[in-house]
Amino acid sequence: MEKDLFLILHNIRSAYNVGAIFRTADAVGVSKIYIGGYTPTPENPKVAKTSLGAENSVEWEKYFNTWKLVEELKSKQIKVVALEQSKNSRDYRQFKSKFPLAVVVGNEVKGLSSNILKRVDSTWHIPMRGKKESLNVMVATGVFLYKILE
């Protein structure tokens, strides 16, 4: 990808989800992954097992305070969007990519905190047609990242 695209993983529980997100990030050309909160890093063997080496091709950085990171990126003129179902979220199919761009994804159960959501430029969701309320964080991240490539 020729444009700067960043990914912020906040409080993701599963090392396997993190590893799979690294593989997807490599596939779409993510410039850097910021790993926030208690999200496992590639130093965790489960992350490395699932990422199949993508942790070596995608730059990453551990960053404990995600809301401060959002503010820091925005101060550098990087648009920051969240992938989260909320009362203010919009259908991801309407998303128009503008770079540089950072995408924040959160915990598999709790999602993103209001402290983060109030700081992002916009919030987007993937509509669900079945009985389940959401997709797995890795799947949702992949869907949204490929939308960004359009």
What positions do the PLM features span?
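RNA substrate-binding interface of SAM-dependent RNA methyltransferases
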Residues: M1-S86
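Residues that form or flank phosphate/diphosphate-binding pockets in enzymes
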Residues: Y16-N17, R90, G111, L135
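Short amphipathic alpha-helical segments
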Residues: A20-I21, K46-V47, R93-F95, N115-K118, ...
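Short, acidic/turn-prone active-site loops that include or flank metal/cofactor-
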Residues: Y38-P40, E108-K110, M128-K132
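Active-site/ligand-binding-proximal alpha/beta "capping" segment
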Residues: Q85-P127
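Structured adenosyl-cofactor binding patch, chiefly the S-adenosyl-L-methionine
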Residues: L117-E150
